Amino acid sequence: MKDKIIVKGAKVHNLKNVSLEIPRDKLIVFTGLSGSGKSSLAFDTIYAEGQRRYVESLSSYARQFLGQMDKPDVESIEGLSPAISIDQKTTSRNPRSTVGTVTEIYDYLRLLYARVGVPHCPKCGKEITQQSVDQIVDQIMELPERSKIMILAPIIRGRKGTHEKVLENIKKQGFVRARIDGEIYDLTEDEIKLEKNIKHNIEAVVDRIIVKDGIEGRLTDSIETSLKMAEGLVLVNIIGEEDRLYSEHFACADCGISIDELAPRMFSFNSPFGKCERCDGLGTLMEIDEDLVVPNKDLSIRGGAISTWGDSRMKEESWTYCVLKALMEKYNFDLDTPYKDLPKKVQEVLMYGEPEKLKVTYTKENVTAVYNHSFEGEINNLRRRYMETNSDTMKAEIEKYMSDNPCPKCKGARLKPEALAVTVGGKNIFEFTSMAIREELDFINSINFSEKDKIISSQIIKEIQSRLSFLINVGLDYLDLARKAGTLSGGEAQRIRLATQIGSQLMGVLYILDEPSIGLHQRDNDRLISTLKQLRDVGNTLIVVEHDEDTMREADYIVDIGPGAGEHGGKIVASGTLDEIMSNENSLTGKYLTGAKKVELPEERRKGNGNFITVKGAKENNLKNVTAKFPLGTLTMVTGVSGSGKSTLVNEILYKGLNKIVNKAKDLPGKFKEITGYENIDKIIDIDQSPIGRTPRSNPATYTGTFDIIRELFSQTQEAKMRGYKPGRFSFNVKGGRCEACSGDGIIKIEMQFLSDVYVPCEVCKGKRYNRETLEVKYKGKNIADVLNMTVEEALEFFENIPRIKNKLQTLMDVGLGYIRLGQPSTQLSGGEAQRIKLAYELSKRSTGKTLYILDEPTTGLHIHDVNRLVKILQRLVDGGNTVIVIEHNLDMIKCADYIVDLGPEGGDKGGTIIATGTPEKIAGAKESYTGKYLKKYL
């Protein structure tokens, strides 16, 4: 019993009463077509139950913070361990999260810098030493004669609590006053009640002195008292100046600057003791961006160059026009000159204002008057309104014209100057985290510590080294620890969490992973597989939902789920070792593994239509002044190892650059010199894996526009006409036809305190979303709720005589989505499914033959059989004269390209150049190309 996990009667989603035995402490791959039920079995059944049982064992107090898991629809699961899921969805979007903080390496670094860091003066850069009482007295005596000062002992600094004992203690030592959170209190008279959950500063007032000759003795006593009370610190409050902090520990004798005792919190950009005060520790500031305020500098002011000004402002009777008239008289320009040709001074005044008051003549209701007006400029105006408004809508509106820029104070380093002045091995903590991970490991290994520092740091260094090594082993050596977590791809984020788990060295755990090979080049795949085996060998069970052939060949056990997708899936087709799967007649996966089935090579490679889109001088992120040519009328793949610059070139520069030129979009592209050849395309479409909608109200029928036609069809029925129902009656988003008890959701959310929220079908409409009257209207015997509950395949048969609906549904069938329901909430669709719905929507439109489609790893989540289908669809788009550019690692996909742009040679700093371009055959012959090396086997 102990060596197996036994699942009996799983019925979650489309699973058909599945029973299964899988070995423990092995590497198990779940595979099958997209939508066959792999995730339902791995995540929604096995993981959900493992997690639920663990959480159930905790107290109800702890459970309210964790959220209770629902019990999955399964009869029983035996042999379960506590389960940890490592999926793609849980990347932190918090701008404060970095690779360093997510992997916890940054915590060890803070400790390292606090314990063995060498402090320097932030002003002059000299190494800082401790200050004696005499030095402190001498510096105070240099203040102007008759300066009023207060000597304070900083006892509590930024700590939560009521601190009653501390205040009592100060009183007992004979002090009558204390400064609490910046205010002076009389300890004998005032009743002081401090808020328990707020951080406080408490300083005892030791002495109040006027600086003059002869006070040195008294000053020395007061400073010694303060140093004793506040563990080596004294705070001098000078009337009309900033407080000065002196320390018998660290201070610069030349500049008179003291810094706090080194502590880990000083290096945290989330702590008030470490973060840069200007940007609040984010490293960037949102600023109004002139390129967003004036996106098209070829336009004139009258023609709409300043995008924040509507047409009404250009009417001659408007106030803005009268102000502009006064500016025109002063600077001699007109409103019809293209913005780029206006003198620099005029552009500056329009954006940042006119220092002198203008005489503005303005007529309102036949009364003309002359006003003295200060013109503040459009950028200053937006900035002021942003600071003053309390309206979230107004803020969101103005944020459209803002972009993130490095903070001018910390230059993006996020920390205070004092923290950045501390070095280990000659580098400060920001310089260290900005290096690529492989360089960081080399640097850590090369530091020469003194004997004392070696003893202090040995344990910390060991932890940092092992964690950096794990990141390198999962193929992330090109990242840096300062990289924001929100900018990572799903695959990168998942592999970081994988590295963190290996670092935790747990055993006896059930790990469930969702396609860890996503975004990984074949070259790095071997390292990933050995990492997975390492996790298994420690004594863990790994269930990996995966389509990657290499991973399957290395697995101990494979479970093939199918045979089809959706309604046609949900059964175990085959399970066993690699050989057993390959010899199983029923297994589609087995047929591809043996080579009986494969993705066929195209009969010929297209040459394109002779036109190119060329990106010149691309320099964003790690791109090294790259010039890339993309032939139009072809299927082009952009390849290269992880971190080589593919996404930067295609998404940040090509897509955003063209989007700005062709669609006048506001998104700022990355750095490049120019893009040529764009006149040969009329549309640019990015088909990504983002959800088709954020709420359960959006679904495949609404996204593809099918639902509008279906509602129209229902409103044309005899019954609907008699009742006077229009198409709006059949919408679940507006009042009229929908069930008002659940507002057309079909379910009602019941909030539970200690348990997870419960969703129950609406009692009134029984989950059908519509009221009784609406459901009485039928088309071919089915009401609108029945239609929404049909799969695409069923609906195609049902509506075969309605060409407008049939065409849209046929494209959904073509992309392999016959199994999804028309009304399936978008929140229940995977990224791959969302992407294919978008593809189907594009296929159903009339092609202009001049569209450029961009896809980023469309094979994510696709079984090799689905990849075969996808290739055919993309070829169909190109056959219509369009151009498709795909970022891809899947070699079955790459071999079908007409043209390849291969980036490399490595990731990060060692990447960012074009290694080879041309047909797959040409790439396979390129010596430098890693892609070519692996592609040879597929051609």
From Swiss-Prot:
Residues 309-588, 608-936 form the ABC transporter domain. One of its GO terms (molecular function) is zinc ion binding. GO terms for biological process: nucleotide-excision repair; SOS response. ATP binds at residues 32-39, 640-647. GO terms for cellular component: cytoplasm; excinuclease repair complex. It is found in: Cytoplasm. It comes from the Bacteria. The UvrABC repair system catalyzes the recognition and processing of DNA lesions. UvrA is an ATPase and a DNA-binding protein. A damage recognition complex composed of 2 UvrA and 2 UvrB subunits scans DNA for abnormalities. When the presence of a lesion has been verified by UvrB, the UvrA molecules dissociate. Belongs to the ABC transporter superfamily. UvrA family. Forms a heterotetramer with UvrB during the search for lesions. This is UvrABC system protein A. It comes from Clostridium perfringens (strain 13 / Type A). The gene is uvrA.
